[in-house]
Amino acid sequence: MQYIKLGTTGLDVSPVAIGAMTYGDPGRGHPVWSLGEDESRPLIKHAIDSGINFFDTANMYSQGSSEEILGRALRDFAQRDDVVIATKLRHPVRSGPNGKGLSRKAIMTEIDHSLRRLGTDYVDLYQIHRNDHSTPLEETLEALHDLVKAGKVRYLGASSMPAWEFAKALHLQRAEGWARFVSMQDHYNLLAREEEREMIPLCLDEGVGTIVWSPLARGRLARAWDDAKATTRSSNDGFADMLYTPLTEQSEDRKSVV
């Protein structure tokens, strides 16, 4: 495996990362098509044996069971210092006040829950899953900075923001001397190329690494077009039809891309 640096950091990561949204208890919420622990573990082990060291999950995936399954597998199959664990927060993980978002309280609470589920005392990359417009950006950024200083987080990242909003966050971090976002996890593939307009040029200019989510367009680019709805996931993944034109409405020009 030829490792690369994440953005302009000194962190070595495999160019292929394993997204663990697919791993989790299907009885514990989104996504309902996730693989249980017995099915997930061989895939995680194969990734490690292949030299992949970069694993990405989130607190909301299968209500935390993705973090639990990934954490147990990594403890069994790898040394902690050899892997890079990334997770995220922002979306609802429980009902009631402060069960979601990027307030200082939510951030301080959710990092501890994620560390417990992952079975580690630090996360390599802690990402905001989306921005939280009900919380002042300064509150969010300072709380994230404090996690780095406390040793619970090594690096900070963001995901799925408008370029102007991400630029504002980077400016505030620089101006205040706070730990900066070193990565942007954005939606980018052959069917979704909007990020080429502003976000990717911004990341190149700022030295921010890009991590792609849905590189295979939630399976649409992974198999023959007529088989695109042939899997349990594809037949139950309504979010895919929100991101992309429904398969039944695709034009011949669209199909030719695949």
Residue ranges of model-derived segments:
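N-terminal binding-site loop/beta-alpha segment at the start of enzyme catalytic domains
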Residues: 1-83, 149, 217
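Active-site gating/metal-coordination segments in enzymes
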Residues: 94-127, 187, 191-194
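Beta/alpha (TIM)-barrel catalytic core signal, keyed to glycine-rich beta->alpha loops juxtaposed to Asp/Glu
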Residues: 3, 131, 135-258
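Active-site mouth loops of central-metabolism enzymes
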Residues: 24-38, 93-108, 129-135
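Acidic (Asp/Glu)-rich catalytic clusters
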Residues: 49, 73-84, 115-119, 148, ...
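Short, acidic/polar
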Residues: 33-47, 101-118, 166-171
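Conserved, mostly hydrophobic/aromatic
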Residues: 6, 18, 40, 47, ...
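Short acidic capping loops at alpha-helix termini that bridge into adjacent secondary structure
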Residues: 14-15, 80-83, 87, 121-125, ...
